[in-house]
Amino acid sequence: MTERSRSGKTAWDKEKTRELFRRYKETDDPDAREQLVMSHMNLVRFLANKFKNRGEPLDDLMQVGYLGLLKAIDRFDPERGLEFTTFATPTILGEIKRHFRDKGWSVR
């Protein structure tokens, strides 16, 4: 039986994520990038849900959030010892807030 962390991911999942980042950073493997995006889609959904009652469709917010996720994946350095979700959350939120700002809406 594997030990689960508070987030519900097993230690194997975290190690697999680290390995995908190493592979992506070393070889620019598009398959590794795609797997990283797919494995973090729930993070984008969770963060986009915080803004869903602001007059924008959830699908649009998630699309903007995915742009932030892609930026975070491209900029993340696994050697720094930081969890990816900790690194990616401000980038995803920033993209969503920028979307509202560009439309002229105030988000607090």
Language-model-derived ranges and their functions:
Residues 1-106:
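Alpha-helical promoter-recognition and RNA polymerase-docking modules of transcription initiation factors
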